[in-house]
């Protein structure tokens, strides 16, 4: 039964394929899975159960995603070419963009994320190709070499600071990860005695793959469809950065201290756990990044967030996100989970954000002892 949960991944993606095959207003079918899944994730109880799966069939869901995404774009081009999808209809264009964006972000990001942590070259190459669909084909470089080492510290561009909106975070995280990837690639080549300008530099692959998808779609389906692809990639990139935003928002850690159970937010929804390849069962992934997604242990005592779907929607309206989720959750984290040193970092972050210093009196008592 637990293995079957993960087949939600290809089923959701298949909804997009069916929509593009039939064309017309069916192109909205992929995007329509978002509100349906959100309702289920909100009304169903949280799921803290450990998984008992068939590793082969659980892993199969990961390897199906790349051919499914290629098929999704193939059916899009086919639908435009045979007239089933009309790009002169604004609602159909919007449906194409949102379906592509949603499915390129979820479940494609979680699958790509899982595969980039595998040790074999094949899944890692598949992860890079999957990341092309959300506009970040070199995501694995900074993710593995920066985020996993420096999370919850100022050195990690994937950790949003207190008071930061999702809109500014998408930009800062994108710029930060690209800069880190370029720097890491150059250092890697220098250690091998090669020039950073060597053609084996993955930065060239990054640029080539970014151009390849919209370029190929434009060639096969016309420039208008190329623009649809670019728009979907941009939105998908925002969805992708949202995962980091909501899983690490405002958390702090002393760089000299190890990563512990309280250093990530977890979203344990019954739907989002399998759909997200357990990426929302987050903290044990950071403690050991090579643990397979279905082997991650749910940590009921670790910091918890509401449904990730709800967080995404509230995050789009920063005042609501701050008032209803971010401030209450961070106040609880500071008071219940943070070490004394982390409370000092947290209050410095609050002061910078213009937030209340809710631990200041406690810090004063500790200092006076």
Swiss-Prot record:
Coiled-coil stretches noted in the UniProt entry, renumbered to this chain: none
Binding locations of Fe cation 2: 148, 282, 285-286
Cofactor(s) required, per the database record: Fe(2+)
Molecular function terms, GO-annotated: metal ion binding; monooxygenase activity
EC numbers on record: 1.14.15.26
Segments crossing the lipid bilayer: 8-28, 60-80, 91-111, 207-227, 305-325
Biological process annotations from GO: catabolic process; lipid metabolic process
Major site of localization recorded for this protein: membrane
Subcellular compartments: Cell inner membrane
Enzyme class: oxidoreductase
Alphabetical list of InterPro entries matching this protein: AlkB/XylM (IPR033885), FA_desaturase_dom (IPR005804)
Signal peptide: none
Source taxon at top rank: Bacteria
Disulfide feature: none
GO cellular component assignments: plasma membrane
Cross-referenced Pfam families: FA_desaturase
pH dependence of this protein's activity: Optimum pH is 7.0.
Keywords of the record: Aromatic hydrocarbons catabolism, Cell inner membrane, Cell membrane, Iron, Membrane, Metal-binding, Monooxygenase, Oxidoreductase, Plasmid, Transmembrane, Transmembrane helix
Membrane topology: Multi-pass membrane protein
Role, per record: Component of a monooxygenase that catalyzes the first step in the degradation of xylenes and toluenes. XylM catalyzes the hydroxylation of the methyl side chain of xylenes and toluenes. The electrons are provided by the electron transfer component XylA. The best substrates are m-xylene and p-xylene, followed by toluene. Shows weak activity with o-xylene. In vitro, is also active with substituted compounds, such as chlorotoluenes. Cannot use benzyl alcohol.
Family membership noted in the UniProt record: Belongs to the fatty acid desaturase type 1 family. AlkB subfamily.
Subunit structure, as described in the record: The xylene/toluene monooxygenase is composed of two subunits: the electron transfer component XylA and the hydroxylase component XylM.
Protein name listed in UniProt: Xylene/toluene monooxygenase hydroxylase component XylM
Organism whose genome encodes this protein: Pseudomonas putida (Arthrobacter siderocapsulatus)
Gene from which the chain derives: xylM
